[in-house]
């Protein structure tokens, strides 16, 4: 049984929902065991609460050393000025021991994101790739095999770099059905690749 981790940071719940869809997609592939975890919040609870953060997320927090236990990891983060959120960056910066030991070499990695109005989604995903490449991971995107990825009939996130959702300037927009389809497919796509490598 191949093991897949969906690891995310979500402040307002958009990436949490996308992560659930990614995990659902991965679970649809026989031969994989999927775990959903989040990176710890680095803001003091009072500050996060005042900012309107969603603090009641069901996924348990992960520890950096756990990454070595999985055959593939799908990372989810909101966009912060075209980069990953600081909480995710902080988590990844604690993986130096895994890098030294080569614990992540050859494992699959994929990234999904959210933005306010669409700007920065692709650079957020590619901002991950430097770290993943240094770890020797195999980077997986979102191929143009789904009609939803080419459908421009409504605003939506997502590109061949990875699934994405547009939250709106005030954060009120939730992931759309098409965005969730893309997220689910990304999870399934990674799972199929992992199973093939047996």
From Swiss-Prot:
Entry GO MF terms: flavin adenine dinucleotide binding; FMN binding; NAD binding; NADH:ubiquinone reductase (non-electrogenic) activity; NADP binding; NADPH dehydrogenase (quinone) activity
Keyword set, alphabetical order: Flavoprotein, FMN, NAD, NADP, Nucleotide-binding, Oxidoreductase
UniProt cofactor note: Binds 1 FMN per monomer.
Enzyme superclass (EC): oxidoreductase
UniProt cross-references to SUPFAM superfamilies, sorted A to Z: Flavoproteins
Essential cofactor(s): FMN
InterPro entries: Flavodoxin/NO_synth, Flavoprotein-like_sf, Flavoprotein_WrbA-like, FMN_Rdtase-like_dom, NQO
PROSITE patterns: FLAVODOXIN_LIKE
Domain of life where this protein originates: Bacteria
Binding residue positions for NAD(+): 12
Binding positions for substrate per the UniProt entry: 99
Family (UniProt): Belongs to the WrbA family.
Protein name: NAD(P)H dehydrogenase (quinone)
């Amino acid at each position: 049984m191949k093991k897949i981790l969906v690891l995310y940071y979500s402040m307002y719940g958009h990436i949490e929902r996308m992560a659930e869809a990614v995990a659902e997609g991965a679970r649809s592939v026989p031969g994989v065991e999927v775990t959903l975890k989040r990176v710890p919040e680095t803001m003091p609870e009072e500050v996060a609460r005042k900012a309107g953060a969603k603090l009641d997320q069901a996924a348990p927090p992960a520890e950096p050393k756990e990454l070595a236990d999985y055959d593939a990891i799908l990372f989810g983060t909101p966009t912060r000025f075209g980069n990953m959120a600081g909480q995710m960056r902080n988590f990844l910066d604690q993986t130096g021991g895994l890098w030294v030991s080569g614990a992540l070499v050859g494992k699959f990695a994929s990234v999904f994101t959210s933005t306010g109005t669409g700007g920065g989604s692709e650079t957020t995903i590619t901002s991950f790739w430097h770290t993943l490449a240094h770890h020797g991971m195999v980077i997986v995107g979102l191929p143009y095999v789904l009609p939803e990825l080419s459908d421009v009939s409504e605003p939506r996130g997502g590109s061949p770099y990875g699934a994405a959702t547009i939250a709106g300037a005030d954060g009120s927009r939730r992931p759309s059905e098409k965005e969730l389809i893309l997220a689910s497919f990304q999870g399934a796509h990674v799972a199929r690749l992992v199973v093939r490598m047996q």
